[in-house]
Amino acid sequence: MVPKFYKLSNGFKIPSIALGTYDIPRSQTAEIVYEGVKCGYRHFDTAVLYGNEKEVGDGIIKWLNEDPGNHKREEIFYTTKLWNSQNGYKRAKAAIRQCLNEVSGLQYIDLLLIHSPLEGSKLRLETWRAMQEAVDEGLVKSIGVSNYGKKHIDELLNWPELKHKPVVNQIEISPWIMRQELADYCKSKGLVVEAFAPLCHGYKMTNPDLLKVCKEVDRNPGQVLIRWSLQHGYLPLPKTKTVKRLEGNLAAYNFELSDEQMKFLDHPDAYEPTDWECTDAP
C-alpha cells in the first residue's frame, strides 16, 4: 500500500500524486484541470514559468463553484513556483502577490517553491525571506524548493534567519535518473521528494525493461512509472494533455510492483535527465 497523502514537516497533508501542468497549451489547461479534479486529482502543480497559473486556477474554481456545499477549497492542494527573474527580496514580495492574484478565487497558495537555485546564494536567501513572510501573512501555507542539490539545502537549513523550513524538493527522478543520494538526503532532512518528469517526457515508453514489467502487471508504461515513484516514497507529477489518460494515471494507486520488479526497473548508475539540470549550480 502506498499512501494517498504524505504529511509535510509543518503538519499539512499533501496528496501523493499531482497533475503536472508544464507545456499544456494554455487554451486547454483549464479544461484538463477541471476534468482532473472531476476524476480524482486533488493536487495541481504549476509555475510562473508555465504561463498558465490563471488557467489552472480557473479549472479548480469551476469545480469548486459547481457544488459549493460539497466541493471544498481545503480538498485542493495548489502549488506554484517563483521564476529565476523573481528572485531577490523585493521582486519576490511582488511576485508572490501576483501569483495569488492570478488565482485569487483560491484565496491562498498551498505550496510555493523557488523554481531553481540558479540565481546564487544571496538572491536565494532573500527570496526565502520573502516566502517566509508570505507564510506569516497567510498568503501561502507551505514553502519549498525545486532543483536544489545538497549544498543548496544545507545553505538554507543552516541560514540563521530560517523560520519556516522547506517542506519539499522537486527534482527530476525516474528509473534512469534516480539521484538516490540526494533523494535520501532530502528525506533525512524532512523534505518530501517530488518527482517531476516521472514519465521521462515519453522518451522511455518503449524501453524493453519497462515493457517487460508492464506485461507482467498488465499496466501501461505511464502507470508503472508512476507506481515505481510512489513505491520509492516519492510524489510523482505526471502530466498529460489527454483527458482520457487522467484517470488512468491515478490507477497507479491500484496495483503493486514486487521487490524484484522494482529492482529490475532501478538503474542506479544511469544518468539520463530529460529536462534541465541545475542541482549542481554554484
UniProtKB/Swiss-Prot annotation:
InterPro entries: AKR, Aldo/ket_reductase_CS, NADP_OxRdtase_dom, NADP_OxRdtase_dom_sf
Active site positions: Y50
Enzyme Commission number: 1.-.-.-
Oxidoreductase as UniProt keyword: yes
CDD domains, per database record: AKR_AKR1-5-like (cd19071)
Record's keyword terms, sorted: Oxidoreductase
Site (Lowers pKa of active site Tyr): K81
Binding sites annotated in the UniProt record for substrate: H115
Tree of life domain: Eukaryota
GO cellular component, one term: cytoplasm
Any Gene Ontology biological process: arabinose catabolic process
Gene3D superfamilies, sorted: NADP-dependent oxidoreductase domain
GO MF annotation: an example: aldose reductase (NADPH) activity
Pfam family, one: Aldo_ket_red
Miscellaneous comment: Present with 6960 molecules/cell in log phase SD medium.
The protein's name in its UniProt record: Uncharacterized oxidoreductase YJR096W
Species assigned in the record: Saccharomyces cerevisiae (strain ATCC 204508 / S288c) (Baker's yeast)
Classification lineage: Eukaryota, Fungi, Dikarya, Ascomycota, Saccharomycotina
